[in-house]
Amino acid sequence: MEIKDAKVFHDYLNGVIEGEDVKKSTKLYSNAKTFYKSVDPSVSDDQIMYEVYSYEHDGLCYGLTVMQPVCVNGDCNVTRGHFHENLDCDEIYCGMGGEGLLLLMDEDYHCHAEKVKCGSVHYIDGHLAHRLVNTGNTEFKVQCMWPSHAGHDYKRVEDHPFTVRVFKENGELKVEEE
C-alpha cells in the first residue's frame, strides 16, 4: 500500500493553506472602498484589507480568510459579503485566530451578528448573506467550508447593502444601524 502526503496543508497555529491547487485572492483598499461608509484618504490604496486562500476538490471548498486590523474612518475592516447564488447551500465558519463578528443578513435585509473567536464554530444558512468584521487589534482568521455549487451573489449585497456597520471609537465598539 502506498501512503501519500496530503496535497494541501493548513498550519492552524501560524500559517495559511498551502498546496499546488490552493488559490489566493488579495483584496486591497483600492478595491474595497465601497464596503465602508466613507473613503479614508489616510489609508493607502495598497493596504491589504484581507486575503482569501481556497481549495476546491470534488464539489467541496475549503478556505481561510485572513483580515488585517484596519479601520476606515473608524469603520472596522469588513469582507465584501455575499448571498449564495444557490440559496440551498449552507456554509460553516470556524474562528482560527483574532476576534471579530460574523454579520448575517436575512432576505428581508435584517441583520444580526455572532461573535467569532478562536475555536468558535458558526453554521450559516444558505438564505443569509454573510460578511466578516475584524473588531480586534490583530489578524482575524476564519476557516470556511462550503459546496462549490453555492456560488457568490455579490450584486444582491451591492444593491441592498448590510444595514449595520461596526465602528471602533477609543477602543470601544459601536454598532450603527442604517
Question: Model-derived features: where do they sit?
Answer:
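N-terminal leader/propeptide segments of preproteins
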Residues: D5-V8
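Active-site region of the double-stranded beta-helix
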Residues: L13-C118, N134-F140, M145-E178
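Conserved SET/PR-domain catalytic core that frames the SAM/AdoMet-binding pocket
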Residues: K117-A129
